[in-house]
Structure formats: C-alpha cells, structure tokens
Design a protein with these regions (language model features):
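Bacterial N-terminal signal peptides that target proteins for export
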Residues: 1-11
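Bacterial signal peptide processing site
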Residues: 24-26
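Short, glycine-/small- and polar/acidic-enriched structural segments
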Residues: 32-171, 181, 185-192, 208
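Short, solvent-exposed loop/beta-turn-alpha elements that line the ligand-binding surface or hinge
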Residues: 62, 132, 210-217, 285-300
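Pocket-lining segment of extracytoplasmic ligand-binding domains
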Residues: 94-95, 174-267
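Secondary-structure end/capping motifs
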Residues: 232-313
Length: 331
C-alpha cells in the first residue's frame, strides 16, 4: 500500500472512532434524561397551559427531565404524591389543610395563579350583586365542610342569613348548564374557565370574587405540590423542573394565543372550542402573575391568613402557620 493510502486509512479510522465516541456520548446524554410523572387535577385546561408549553418548547428537556403530564385517576392527585407514586401534582391550598393536619408529606412549591379567581356566579336576571343576595336563592353545593363554612362567612360578611340560603346538590362538572336551566340559581366557580364558558354560551351572568368580600379567601388555588422526600433527595432536580415550568407560564403570559394552541394540540378534545380556550387563556395569562419574574411565589401572610381562618372556624384543630409551602424552588 502506498504511503498516501496508509494516511487515508488512518484518517478514516480516526474519524470513525470520533463518530462512535460522539454517538456513545449522545446515548449517555439521553440515558441521563429522567422520566417524571406530573399528575394534573382535572382534564387539560388553561390552568395547565404553562406545563404543556414547557414540554412543547423543550424547557423540560433542557432541565434534563422528561415530564409525563398525566390525568388524575380515581385516586386523588395529592394522594399519589403523598404515597410517593409521583413527585409532582396540581392541588389546592384549601384542600391541603386537612392533609397537612394529618401529617401528609407534601409541600406547595409554586402558585399557578397569583390570586384566587374563584367566586359566585348567578343569572343576571336574579340580581345577585352581593353575597347577602344569596338568601332565598338555590345554591349548588358539593357539600364540602370547608366550602359551606366559607359560604357562611361570605354571606354573613354582608349581613345575610346563611340558614336562608337553599342548598341543593351540584353533581355537574359544568355548573353553567344547570344554572342556565334553573336547576340552581348560584354556584361557586373559577372565572377563568366556567366564567368565560358562560360568556361563550351566551349566558348573561353576574359574578363575585370571594376575595373581594373576605380577604382571607385570597388563598392560592391551584398550586403545584411535591412529595417532601423527593424534594429532600432531589433538590437540584426539583429546582430545575420548577424553573422549567416557570418559563412555560411566563411564555404563556406573553403569548396567550400561541399558548392556547399548544394546549389544544395536546388536548385535541378542545379543538372545537378554540375560541373559548383562547378567551380563557387571555384572561388567565393576566392572572398567572402581575410580575412575570415573580410567577409562582407565595406571600406568607396570605397563605397563613387562610389557615388561621380555618382554625378559627373549626375546620382545623392544629396551627398550620408557615406550613405547607416554600419559595425555595421557584425563586
């Protein structure tokens, strides 16, 4: 073999070796990507948009994780996290109270929406413009002790007699249809979904935010919770996951229509409701945070105020001051 041929063979051999090493490194890098289950609280909706954006835009991949967004099974999303079956889930501060009192190993690590956007909706023709106007009306209830205690405080805060509010079962996943059909007159909803839904369906309605009447009711709902053992053993990974989610919600704040389409892409059952989803997203994109850099952060005074109310009204026996939340991973 000529010298030039030997040189050529040497170069080719070296290049093949480099390619093989590079491929091996790529395989190793892919192997480092950790699969993580994230449990939703309900079917996909605009509370979840930032999660789908984070997945679509590759923010999770940049964090070294492959997050699988899963619908909740019959078992509560919080119970899956408590039992270590998933590290993260969506839940609610008000529902966390009883779990925390029983010693559940969960912590809220990010607030999806800065302020409580839930409240009471009614037909405009019924002229319910204050909580005291619920007196004599049919309220669709889930018969949850915390719900009814809050409603009592709400009505009485404006001088109404809670005992004169007629409570009827609300077993519908969509409260707008039974209100429109007169099954009950009022219901507790989240404006960002059911409130916008009412408008999209042409239901002329009044709406009252709970927080506008009782300051303690400006609690955090929904929130992202995590398993305490997972947080302890995987601090850096948890921080990267939450930071990726934060980027997803920040993107949704700045690009609501594109974010809505990303949600629809991942939840095709919403495709026929695109106009409604976009309106819902436009509303929530302004509610996620007043300052995008502070998305997800908890105000300790507001968190504690609700649990103090819980204790004063017999919902809780234990003092949960400063328990159940952290800003460590979201800042």
């Amino acid at each position: 073999m000529k010298k030039t041929g030997k040189v050529f063979l040497t170069i080719v051999t070296a290049l093949v070796a480099v390619v093989l090493v590079a491929c091996g490194q790529g395989t190793d890098k892919e192997a480092e990507v950790k699969k993580i289950d994230f449990i939703l609280d309900w079917t996909p909706n605009t509370n979840h948009t930032g999660l789908y954006v984070a997945k679509e835009k590759g923010y999770f991949k940049e964090a070294g994780v492959d997050v699988d967004l899963k619908l909740p099974p019959e078992e509560s999303s919080s119970d899956l996290v408590i039992n270590g079956k998933a590290p993260f889930a969506i839940y609610f501060q008000d529902y966390m109270a009883k779990k925390l009192e029983k010693g559940a190993g969960i912590t809220a690590v990010a607030a999806i929406v800065e302020h409580n956007t839930s409240g009471i909706i009614s037909r405009k023709s019924d002229n319910v413009t204050s909580p005291k106007d619920l007196v004599g009306k049919k309220y669709g209830t889930w018969n949850d002790p915390t719900e009814l205690a809050m409603l009592k405080t709400l009505v009485e805060s404006q001088g109404g007699d809670f005992e004169k509010v007629e409570k009827v079962p609300n077993n519908d996943s969509n409260s707008i249809t039974p209100i429109a059909n007169g099954v009950f007159d009022t219901a507790w909803i989240y404006y960002g979904w059911d409130g916008i839904l009412a408008k999209s369906q042409g239901v002329d309605a009044n709406f009252m935010y709970l927080k506008d009447y009782v300051k303690e009711f400006d609690y955090y709902s929904p929130v992202i919770i995590a398993n305490n053992d997972y947080l302890k053993d995987n601090k850096e990974e948890a921080r990267k996951v939450i930071q990726a989610i934060k980027k997803g919600y920040q993107y949704a704040m700045e690009h609501p229509e594109e974010a809505a389409d990303i949600l629809i892409k991942n939840a095709p059952e919403l495709k026929e409701k695109r106009d409604f989803v976009i309106e819902s997203q436009k509303y929530l994109s302004k509610e996620y945070a007043s300052d995008k850099e502070k998305w997800g952060q908890f105000d300790a005074d507001r968190w504690n105020a609700f649990y103090k109310w819980d204790k004063e009204n017999g919902i809780l026996k234990e003092d949960l001051t400063d328990k159940g939340f952290t800003n460590e991973f979201v800042k």
